[in-house]
C-alpha cells in the first residue's frame, strides 16, 4: 500500500472510508468518530528527508504536509485546507 506514496491513513477494518462515512452521515446516520493512524513509507524520499530534519517549524510543516496528503489520497479533505495550500506553496517555492 505504500509502494509509491510517502504516507497513507490506515483504518480499522470496521471503520468506513471517508466517502461511505459522508454518505451515511448525509442519510442521517450517527457514526462513531473515526481514528485512523498515519503510516509512513521509510523508503520514500520525503520521509527520509523528514527523518533528517531537527524538531522545529520545518519538521512540523513537512509532517503536516504528509498527513494532509494521506488524507487527500484516500478521498478526504485536510482539516485545514488553507493551511495545506500555504504549506504546499512554501515547499514548492523553497520557503519552508
Segment roles from a protein language model:
Residues 1-96:
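Long, intrinsically disordered, charge-dense linkers/tails
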Amino acid at each position: 500500500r505504500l509502494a509509491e506514496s510517502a504516507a497513507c491513513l490506515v483504518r480499522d477494518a470496521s471503520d468506513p472510508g471517508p466517502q461511505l462515512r459522508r454518505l451515511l452521515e448525509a442519510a442521517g446516520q450517527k457514526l462513531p468518530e473515526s481514528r485512523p493512524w498515519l503510516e509512513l513509507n521509510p523508503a520514500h524520499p520525503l520521509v527520509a528527508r523528514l527523518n533528517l530534519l531537527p524538531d522545529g517549524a520545518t519538521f512540523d510543516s513537512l509532517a503536516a504536509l504528509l498527513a494532509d496528503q494521506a488524507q487527500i489520497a484516500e478521498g478526504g479533505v485536510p482539516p485545514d485546507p488553507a493551511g495545506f495550500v500555504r504549506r504546499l506553496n512554501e515547499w514548492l517555492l523553497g520557503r519552508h
